[in-house]
Design a protein with these regions (language model features):
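Short, mixed-charge low-complexity intrinsically disordered segments
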Residues: 38-68
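Predominantly extracellular/luminal cell-surface or secreted proteins
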Residues: 9-11, 23, 51-53
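Solvent-exposed serine/threonine-rich low-complexity stretches and specific carbohydrate-binding patches
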Residues: 22-25, 66-68
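Residues that cap or initiate secondary-structure elements
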Residues: 14-16, 27-29, 56
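A short, charged, amphipathic alpha-helix used as a generic interaction element across diverse proteins
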Residues: 23-47
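Short aromatic-glycine-(Arg/Gly/Cys) micro-motifs in beta-strand/loop hairpins
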Residues: 1-16, 45
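N-terminal leader/targeting signatures
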Residues: 6, 29-32, 64
């Protein structure tokens, strides 16, 4: 099992539950995160966050945040 899991979390404006995409590779997670760095994302989301979970320590770390 990989040591890290990366998550892109989309906080929705409509009050529905957050959408979460999980990735095992940082490069793919960052690519997905960057795809939403555009003005149209502000119409659906209040925030998009890229985080990393360390399975050895159990710690979560926020790597990047976009706030609209």
């Amino acid at each position: 099992m990989e040591r890290y899991t990366y998550e892109v979390t989309f906080t929705r404006l409509d009050g529905q539950p957050d959408e979460i995409q999980q990735h095992t590779g940082e490069e793919l997670a960052r690519e997905c995160f960057r795809l939403f760095d555009e003005p149209d994302s502000a119409e659906m989301y209040s925030k998009i966050e890229l985080s990393r979970h360390d399975w050895e320590t159990g710690m979560d770390e926020i790597l990047e945040t976009m706030t609209f």
